[in-house]
Structure formats: C-alpha cells, structure tokens
C-alpha cells in the first residue's frame, strides 16, 4: 500500500481506531464498497448526527462518537465461567415446559390421590424426649453419640450401639451373639468367595490371566504408567482447539482431572483404552473431549456417523448427550443423535436419517434402528465408546453386544470406561480390542475421597425400616433443601415408600423400571430442580447420573455386591465435594461382608482419603412411635394402591380404544409400513434369559469347598454342608455315649480278669 500523506510515511506503528479521524491516512487502494456503506450509515443518522459531528471538533481527539466509552476487550474470554446448573435430562423435542407437557402421556396423578387421603398436607409430628432438648444439647448429642468409628470387625462384634438396645432382653442378645459366632467362621471363608460377581474374587480372577496372556493382549504397561504420571495445569496445555477450549470454559472446567490428563492425549492418538477411576472424576468428559477434537478435522461435505457411544440406561444416555452438546456448543458442524428406548421412535428415525456425527444409544434401541431405520448405517464408524463398560459386559447385554460388534467395522478405536472396570481378558475378547492401553487411576473398588460412610445396624427390625427412613430424612434435612437419594432393591418397595412418605407429609419422587420414560425423566428433573428433595429409586439410577449437590445417599436395602454399593454411594461426594452415605445393614453374611469391604477400603487408603466409616446411632424409641403411626395407615395405603390400579385400568382402556380408532382410520397406512425385525426370535430370547439367570445364580466355590466336592466325587464321603449347632450337640452326645460305653466295657473286663 502507498500512503497518501508524507506525514505517515515513516511511522513505526499503524494508527488504530482510537486515533483521531483527521489523522487517518488516505489509502490509494481504498475499498469502494466500504466507503458507500459508510455514507449510507451517515445518511440514516440524519440531522442530529451532523450536529454531533460538528460538536465533536471541540471534544478530545481520542474519543469517537460511534464507540462505547465503557467498552473493553476481554482478553481472558476462555477463562470465564457461567453459573452451571447441571446437565439437562430432556429428550429431543423437550426443550421447554410446554413441549414437555405436550410430550408426556396422560397418567395417574398419585400425589392427587394421596392428598385426597389426607397426605402431603402437613409433616407428621412425633412427640419424643429428643425434641424437647435445647439446640445446644442436640448439637452435642449429634457430635458425641450419633456416630461411632467402626473397626475392621464392624459394629464392635455385636456390642450395643444405642440406648434403645438396652431394652432388649438378655436372652435375645445371647441368641444373636451365638448366631454371630456360628457365622463368623463361614464369613471368613466367604471373604474369598464372589458374592454374585462381587467381593474379592474379581481380583483373584484377574490374576488368573497369565503374564504372557496380558503381554499379548494389552499394550506395554509403561504406556499406561507414563500416561498416569502426566499432570496438566490447564486444558490449554493439552493442545486442544480454541472452540473446544471455549466450550470447556463455559462449563467451568479449568484443570483436567487425573483421568482426563491420562486418557485425552492417548485417545487423540487413536489408540484403544481401558480406563477406570472413581465415580465423579470426569470420565464422560475424558472420552467426549478427544472425540470432538478429532471430529474437527472430518470431511465437511460428507454426512456420516463416525462415533457410537453405548450406555446401559436411558437416563445416562440423555445426560451424556447433553455433556457432548455443551462441550461442542462453539464447534460448528458437529451433530448429535440420541437413540434410546421409551421415547418417540419416529422422531429418532428422522434425526438418524441425517446421519449425525455422534450417536449416543442404549444397545436394544440401537440394534432396532440399524435393522429397521432407513438411511441409517454404521459402515463409517471410527470410534466406539462403552461407558459403564463392566455393566455392559454382563450377561444381560451379552447378546446385544455380540450383535453390535458384528455390525460395526473392525478397524475402529475402542474406548472403555467404568468406575469398577473388570479388565479380565476373557470378558474383553469379544470386543476386538487392538493392544488397549490400560489406565487405572485409583485403587480398584475405592469410594470417593471425601465420602463419609455411615452404617445403621437393623438387627431384626426390618419392619421398622420405613419409620427409620422417615426419621432419618427429617433429621438430615429438616428444611427440605438437600437432595437425598434413597436406593431400594425392588420397584414395589419404591412405590410403597413413596405412598408412606406422602401420607406422613413428605414429598418424594420415585425412579424405576415400571415407570414410563417420560415419567422417569420428569422425576429426575423435579429432583434436580428441588421440587421434590427426595428421590427413591432402584439400581437403575446407581450408575453415571450426575445431579449436582446430592448431599446424602441412603441405602434402604443393601446391594447385592460391593461394586453396586460403590456405584450407589458414588452419586454423592462427586468432583471433590463432600458427601454422606447412610446404609441400613441387616444380619446376613452378604450385608456384613459389604460393610467389611467398605471399612477395609477406608483403612487401606487412609493416607489418600479424607473419608470415614462410622456406625450411626438412632433413637429406636422414637422410631417405634413413628412405626405405630405408619401401621395405623395400612388400610389407607391399600386403598390408595387399589384406587391407583383402577385409574390405570381406565387409562389403559381409553388407550386401547384410541388405538382401535386409529387402526380403522389409518388402516392402509399402518398396513403399508414394513414389519420391524429383531435379531432374535421369541424362543431365542427365552433361552437367553434362562441361561443368564442360571449363570447369575451359579455359586462360585472357593478352594476348600472345591476340594470337598472333588473328594465327594471320588467316593470319600466328605460332608457337603457345614455343621450346625444341632449337629455339634449330636456329635457331643455320641462322643459322650462312646466314652461311657468304653469305660463300662473296661470295668467289665477288669472284673472278669479278677
């Protein structure tokens, strides 16, 4: 360029927008379009603008009339964070409340029935001595006697834990102690056994893989070790693109977590990964960030599905989809698809026709779309992600997983993530992994570092558990401002507890498989927004769900294994926050072994964690009073269940009527639709379920039992069961009789000799 005025010919700097307009050099090669644009804008401003320009001669030269005086450049735009309120649990088409209401099918309003019966009006009030204490005494009592630190034996081997137990008769205590002593030897052996795929045998099973087999299957251990040593101060040091960094900054992500620091660089190289870390450590972002970064360099004009993310539950799939959208919000051209059961099939088909870059799905609906949705195929898939991979590898998903592996291209990248990852080679062979890098950040089967684990010993008071739950929630959250998750074993229990709590004046939600998908999402969203502070759910919600600020997890029923326990309590104390879990412990050996495993984990990781394992004391006298109130409501509870069932039958009949009308009205259109197919016949499904049930119920024998069984098979007549108290008494009597007869025979022989 040639500068038109000599005044600017030798300048070492370029004049900026803040310099006086009179001093701006006139360039010979000026842009005519820009000049015309300037003129048109000046004309629009009219006479008032001319006055301002004339007055501008008297103003400071550094001030321009078209600029905001308070404007500043934000140099740290990538470090700004919005007030993130957690992930959205809304399916496609549910972006606002009106759409959601139109989308949700009509169903029975249980809260309305409970209100008609006198519930959900006022919190039940139970008189007790505890409520008469002053605030100071309450605090002292909570600090001094609510919690007792548990030793490795758990609950002090049957020592009384509270004043309520003193009223128990000595005879009952002696019987319980005798039972505990009888079970003690059995429990020691059961520590070496698997409790329905849980416990310590998983570690033993992993050792069954020989060193040569591991060397052939996995990448060299040095790769994983080096990855774990890498710690990055911020995401910029990971060499990520600016749009991805901007998306992370908008979520408040500042420093990569250990699992993210270890896995992101390796995932960007295209290598297979098997990764494990504690719950709430950022595993979803650990695989979503490298995926989005790699998709930035995809061919822009070719629409194809390149990434498949498989998850075990629908709610988790919806959450992961939202995580991906939030991270990629500033990345242009990346599309997401959701394929989960329970939601509108036609909407999903239309969305998958556009071949989104990333499809997040549950296995069953994913196979359904591959087989029956036009224009959707997986021929160009480059990355397969399995979140909660240990659950996906279990028997319930085995058939679907084998079908999916046969449909996907073999030359893909595989990323497997879980908090309780089982990296046994036998279970991973079917996934066609290529020298996967194994990255286990935390010790296996470890709870969150700031989790306080409390245990309440129920003994033989199972009938008091609903009253105990009510009293515990009221004590932990008297104002209803904390989020509390309650885990139960059965769907029926969750539903009944919701009715009981409602009649006692406590608003709670429920989440389990008997609800429709719309009801499930509605329950999660109400809980997230604190419309209901308590959510009673089955293990459906134990994995992956990341709802912010869940302060307490209550295990109303003990889980089947320690792994499931870890996933349950992992709903709280996430991402470095503090949390508390309270578990109701029965007298079964399975319950007590889980408690021992939890205490042992805390003891072994004392130097690495701030967590505690405590025994919680409760006022059983007050709980007895609450239970009397609950028992007085039994007839009302049954009436509510009957009324709800009747309303459901009416709604079902109306639905069948509408279905019949549609069949008549749109008969030709419905008959013209191609029949949907599945990879299994009905008989295959039944056989698969039977085989799965048999494999789950098969007991794993330890070395001692296996030797006894082998000896019995050889004809040595070894006992196949452990001696009971009755057997021991009978043995003692037989031994005594033998000794008596031997002594009498000796005396007779001595007399005959004489």
Curated annotation (Swiss-Prot):
Organism (species): Saccharomyces cerevisiae (strain YJM789)
Annotated gene? DRS1
Q: What is this protein called?
A: ATP-dependent RNA helicase DRS1
Describe the protein's quaternary organization and the partners it interacts with.
Answer: Interacts with RRP1 and associates with pre-ribosomal particles.
State its role: ATP-binding RNA helicase involved in ribosome assembly.
Q: What is known of its domains?
A: The Q motif is unique to and characteristic of the DEAD box family of RNA helicases and controls ATP binding and hydrolysis.
Region listing for Disordered, in residue ranges: 1-61, 119-227, 675-754
Output the SMART domains linked to this UniProt entry: DEXDc, HELICc
**Residue ranges annotated for the Helicase C-terminal domain, each copy included:** 450-641
Q: Which GO terms describe its molecular function?
A: ATP binding; ATP hydrolysis activity; RNA binding; RNA helicase activity
């Amino acid at each position: 360029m040639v500068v038109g005025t000599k005044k600017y010919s030798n300048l070492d700097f370029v004049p900026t927008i803040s310099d006086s307009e009179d001093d701006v050099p006139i360039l010979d090669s000026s842009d005519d379009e820009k000049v015309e644009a300037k003129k048109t804008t000046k004309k629009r401003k009219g006479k008032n603008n001319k006055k301002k320009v004339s007055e501008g001669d008297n103003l400071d030269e550094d001030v321009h009339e078209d600029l905001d005086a308070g404007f500043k450049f934000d140099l740290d735009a990538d470090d700004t964070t919005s007030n993130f309120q957690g992930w959205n649990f809304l399916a496609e088409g549910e972006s606002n409340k009106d759409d959601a209401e139109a989308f949700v099918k009509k169903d029975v309003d249980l809260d309305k029935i409970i209100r008609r019966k006198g519930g959900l009006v006022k919190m039940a009030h139970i008189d007790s001595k505890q409520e008469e204490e002053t605030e100071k005494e309450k605090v002292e009592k909570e600090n001094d006697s609510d919690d007792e630190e548990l030793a490795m034996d758990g609950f002090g081997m049957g020592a009384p834990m509270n004043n309520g137990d003193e009223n128990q008769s000595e005879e009952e205590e002696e019987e319980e102690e005798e039972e505990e002593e009888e079970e003690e030897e059995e429990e020691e052996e059961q520590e070496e056994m698997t409790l329905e795929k849980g416990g310590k045998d998983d570690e033993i099973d992993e050792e069954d893989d020989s060193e040569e087999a591991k060397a052939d299957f996995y990448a060299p251990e040095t790769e994983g070790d080096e990855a774990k040593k890498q710690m990055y101060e911020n995401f910029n040091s990971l060499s990520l693109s600016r749009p991805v960094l901007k998306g992370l900054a908008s979520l408040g992500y500042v420093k990569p977590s250990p699992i993210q620091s270890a896995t992101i660089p390796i995932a960007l190289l295209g290598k297979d990964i098997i990764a494990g870390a504690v719950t709430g450590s950022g595993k979803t972002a650990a695989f979503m960030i490298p995926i989005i970064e790699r998709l930035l360099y995809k061919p822009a004009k070719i629409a194809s599905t390149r990434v498949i993310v498989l998850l075990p539950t629908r709610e988790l799939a919806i959450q992961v989809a939202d995580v991906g959208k939030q991270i990629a919000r500033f990345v242009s051209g990346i599309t997401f698809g959701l394929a989960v059961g329970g939601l509108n099939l036609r909407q999903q088909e239309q969305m998958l026709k556009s071949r989104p870059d990333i499809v997040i799905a549950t296995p069953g609906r994913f196979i359904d779309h591959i087989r029956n949705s036009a224009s959707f195929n997986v021929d160009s898939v480059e990355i397969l992600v399995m979140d909660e991979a240990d659950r996906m590898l279990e028997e319930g998903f085995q058939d679907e997983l084998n079908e999916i592996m046969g449909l996907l291209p073999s030359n893909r990248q595989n990323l497997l993530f879980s908090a309780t990852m089982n990296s046994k080679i036998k279970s991973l062979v079917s996934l066609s992994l290529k020298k996967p890098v194994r990255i286990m950040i935390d010790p296996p089967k470890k709870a969150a570092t700031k989790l306080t684990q409390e245990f309440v010993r129920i003994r033989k008071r199972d009938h008091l558990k609903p009253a105990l739950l009510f009293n515990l929630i009221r004590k932990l959250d008297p104002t209803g401002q904390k989020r509390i998750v309650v885990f139960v074993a059965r769907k029926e229990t969750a539903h009944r507890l919701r009715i009981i709590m409602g009649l006692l004046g406590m608003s709670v939600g429920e989440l389990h498989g008997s609800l429709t998908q719309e009801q499930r999402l509605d329950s999660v969203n109400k809980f997230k927004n604190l419309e209901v502070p308590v959510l009673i759910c089955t293990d459906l919600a134990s994995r992956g769900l990341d709802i912010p600020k869940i302060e307490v997890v209550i295990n109303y029923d003990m889980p089947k294994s320690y792994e499931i326990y870890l996933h349950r309590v992992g709903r709280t104390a996430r991402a470095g926050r503090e949390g508390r879990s309270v578990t109701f412990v029965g007298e079964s050996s399975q319950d007590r072994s889980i408690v021992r495993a939890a205490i042992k984990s805390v003891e072994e990781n004392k130097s690495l964690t701030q967590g505690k394992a405590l025994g919680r004391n409760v006022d059983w006298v007050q709980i007895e009073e609450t239970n009397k109130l609950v028992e007085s409501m039994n007839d009302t509870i049954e009436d509510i269940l009957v009324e709800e069932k009747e309303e459901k039958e009416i709604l079902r009949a109306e639905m069948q009527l509408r279905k019949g009308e549609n069949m008549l009205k749109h008969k030709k259109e419905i008959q013209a639709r191609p029949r949907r197919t599945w990879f299994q016949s009905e008989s295959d499904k039944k056989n698969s379920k039977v085989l799965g049930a048999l494999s789950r119920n098969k007991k794993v024998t330890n070395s001692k039992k296996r030797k006894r069984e082998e000896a019995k098979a050889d004809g040595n007549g070894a006992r196949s069961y452990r001696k009971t108290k009755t057997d021991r008494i009978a043995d003692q009597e037989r031994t005594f009789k033998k000794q008596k007869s031997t002594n009498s025979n000796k005396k007779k022989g001595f007399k005959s000799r004489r």
